[in-house]
C-alpha cells in the first residue's frame, strides 16, 4: 500500500503490482489496493490467461490525474499473451476502462503454435 501511495504521489503515471493476486487469505495485494481508497474497476477478468487481474484508479488529489493501478496475476510472468497485453495499450492511451466484461467474447488465448497476436481472436 505504501509503495503504491509513494509512486502515485511522486508522479507515476501507472502502477503495476505483482504477486498476491489470488483468492487465498494470505494474498494481500487486492486488499492493499482497496485500502488506498482506489476505485476498483474490476478484480477478475473474463480472459485466460489473466482471470485474477485487478484494475483500479487511485486519485492522489492536488490536481494530480487519476493513476491506473493494476494488480497482475502470476501468468504475466510466463504466458506469451495475457489480459495485460489487452489492457496495457488502452491504459497507455489514457482510455478510462470500464468495459472489462466485453473481453468475455474472445477472451481465451488458444496458445497457438505460431502466435499471430494481435491478428487473432484473442481479446476481440
Predicted regions, residues:
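Short glycine/threonine-rich loop/turn motifs
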Residues: 1-123
Amino acid at each position: 500500500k505504501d509503495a503504491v501511495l509513494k509512486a502515485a504521489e511522486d508522479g507515476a503515471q501507472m502502477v503495476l503490482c505483482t504477486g498476491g493476486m489470488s483468492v487465498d487469505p494470505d494474498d494481500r495485494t487486492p486488499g492493499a489496493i482497496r485500502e488506498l481508497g482506489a476505485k476498483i474497476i474490476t478484480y477478475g477478468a473474463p480472459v485466460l490467461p489473466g482471470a485474477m487481474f485487478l484494475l483500479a484508479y487511485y486519485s492522489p488529489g492536488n490536481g494530480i490525474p487519476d493513476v491506473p493501478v493494476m494488480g497482475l496475476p502470476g501468468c504475466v510472468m510466463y504466458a506469451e499473451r495475457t489480459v495485460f497485453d489487452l489492457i496495457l495499450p488502452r491504459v497507455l492511451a489514457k482510455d478510462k476502462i470500464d468495459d472489462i466484461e466485453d473481453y468475455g467474447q474472445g477472451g481465451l488465448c488458444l496458445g497457438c503454435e505460431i502466435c499471430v497476436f494481435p491478428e487473432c481472436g484473442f481479446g476481440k
